[in-house]
């Protein structure tokens, strides 16, 4: 194998593709989605109600749970790797200890990379064909770029850092599943006020901590090291490293774009005023 193609030769063998984790993620998302749709329809929930983009409300709620529940999987395995729980000690053993960029972890590939790859493919399909509210360029870009990053890691590239970028950061999406529901079902927050407020607090806190504070603290040194690899000609594949840098920059931009909106939401919850209202008040003082 020539070094310059090593980063793209991922060996997508039947053993990898047909792992139980990969099959599980492939099956669980549509099963949850259509199972919940059937359940809601049987109970007559949200009959005839649609979003402003024309998506049936029950489809939106089914989507939120079908894609929110798998985030518990990613979060759990990220925590296990971080803390070394349940024999998930790959971060503290070879080969990841001595090679954080090209050491391969079967645990990471099985439990994070393959499932996330499938998750993002499904997310792209649902966004394009089923959920009109998600037909936005930034959503397509996020799903496709994230799936591509998983693909690059299948043969041992950046497996070490997956515990954070694929695992821990998904904690915020677990809370987001509940936070998003009142956008389509306004009465939810009134019927379940404690659950909604707790989820809001958990989402805002985890997003700011994980995606706006810790993300750049980890991403910046990674990008620096990858640039040094390109400079020193030690990258296995210059094209892969370059593409990964661009993908990371794009995803980082999205974290801060969304993070600013979330920080505004947090400010309004705490103060009861939007940032614009606070600025107007200060000007009047």
Predicted regions and their residues:
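Membrane-helix and juxtamembrane interface regions of eukaryotic multi-pass membrane proteins
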Residues: 1-168, 182-285
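Alpha-helical transmembrane segments and their membrane-interface exit regions
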Residues: 168-179
């Amino acid at each position: 194998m020539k070094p310059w193609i090593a980063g793209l030769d991922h060996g997508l063998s039947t053993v990898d593709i047909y792992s139980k984790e990969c099959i599980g993620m492939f099956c669980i998302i549509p099963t949850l989605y259509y199972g919940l749709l059937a359940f809601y329809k049987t109970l007559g929930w949200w009959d005839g109600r649609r979003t402003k983009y024309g998506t049936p409300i029950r489809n939106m709620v089914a989507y939120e749970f079908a894609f929110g529940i798998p985030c518990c999987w990613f979060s759990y395995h990220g925590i296990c790797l971080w803390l070394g729980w349940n024999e998930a000690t790959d971060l503290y053993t070879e080969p990841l200890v001595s090679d954080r960029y090209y050491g391969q972890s079967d645990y990471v590939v099985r439990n994070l990379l393959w499932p996330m790859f499938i998750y993002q493919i499904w997310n792209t399909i649902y966004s394009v064909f089923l959920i009109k509210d998600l037909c936005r360029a930034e959503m397509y870009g996020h799903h496709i770029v994230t799936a591509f990053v998983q693909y690059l890691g299948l043969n041992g590239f950046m497996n070490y850092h997956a515990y954070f970028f694929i695992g821990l950061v998904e904690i915020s999406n677990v809370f987001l599943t509940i936070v998003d529901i009142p956008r389509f079902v306004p009465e939810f927050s009134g019927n379940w006020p404690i659950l909604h407020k707790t989820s809001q607090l958990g989402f805002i806190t985890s997003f700011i901590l994980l995606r706006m504070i810790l993300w750049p603290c980890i991403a910046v040194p990674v990008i620096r090291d990858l640039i040094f690899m390109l400079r020193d000609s030690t990258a296995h594949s210059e094209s892969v490293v370059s593409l990964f840098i661009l993908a990371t920059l794009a995803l980082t931009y999205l974290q801060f774009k969304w993070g600013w909106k979330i920080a505004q939401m947090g400010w309004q919850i705490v103060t009861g005023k939007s940032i614009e209202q606070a600025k107007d008040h200060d000007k009047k003082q």
